[in-house]
From Swiss-Prot:
Residues 61-87 are annotated as: Disordered. Active between 10 and 60 degrees Celsius. Its cofactor is Cu cation; Zn(2+). InterPro entries: SOD-like_Cu/Zn_dom_sf, SOD_Cu/Zn_/chaperone, SOD_Cu/Zn_BS, SOD_Cu_Zn_dom. Binds 1 copper ion per subunit. Binds 1 zinc ion per subunit. PANTHER family: SUPEROXIDE DISMUTASE CU-ZN -RELATED. Belongs to the Cu-Zn superoxide dismutase family. This is Superoxide dismutase [Cu-Zn]. Gene3D superfamilies: Superoxide dismutase, copper/zinc binding domain. It comes from Zingiber officinale (Ginger).
Length: 152
């Protein structure tokens, strides 16, 4: 079993901890919570780079080793890092629970050392017809991020 964690933070008061667990070659289970968000949907993605030297802006694009278009988590044609939306309640808290087979914690496409990013707006899952739909899901600014690191 491989475990990883990302501690999310931002200058906007959004924070959280996201845990990743993978058994063998099975799917990765993502759990955790995020606080300080405005109520509603927020794009939730794994980005390609674990670089936060310029805040969340330096985490690069969505993790996309297969060179596909942006999509929903259940779509065949999607970035590996497309995890859909996280829903914040009226209290601004998100409880994350995702199981996904495209974000392994080991092997050539491992997400260890990359970043998880929470966006300001809903991810349209590539179906919004906006010029950014097929690249970012038109999910808006990056309100919090954290580098995914191995956990003991």
């Amino acid at each position: 079993m491989v475990k990883a964690v990302a501690v999310l933070g931002s200058s906007e008061g959004v924070k959280g901890t996201i845990y990743f667990v993978q058994e063998g070659d099975g799917p990765t289970t993502v759990t955790g919570s995020i606080t300080g968000l405005k109520p509603g949907l927020h794009g939730f993605h794994v980005h390609a780079l674990g670089d936060t030297t310029n805040g969340c802006m330096s985490t690069g694009p969505h993790f996309n080793p297969a060179g596909k278009e942006h999509g929903a988590p259940e779509d065949e044609n999607r970035h590996a890092g497309d995890l859909g939306n996280a829903t914040a309640g009226e209290d601004g808290i998100v409880t994350v629970s995702v199981v996904d087979s495209q974000i392994p914690l080991s092997g050539p496409n491992s997400i260890i050392g990359r970043a998880v990013v929470v966006h300001a707006d809903p991810d349209d899952l590539g179906k919004g017809g906006h010029e950014l739909s097929k690249t970012t899901g038109n999910a808006g600014g990056r309100v919090a991020c954290g580098i995914i690191g191995l956990q003991g």
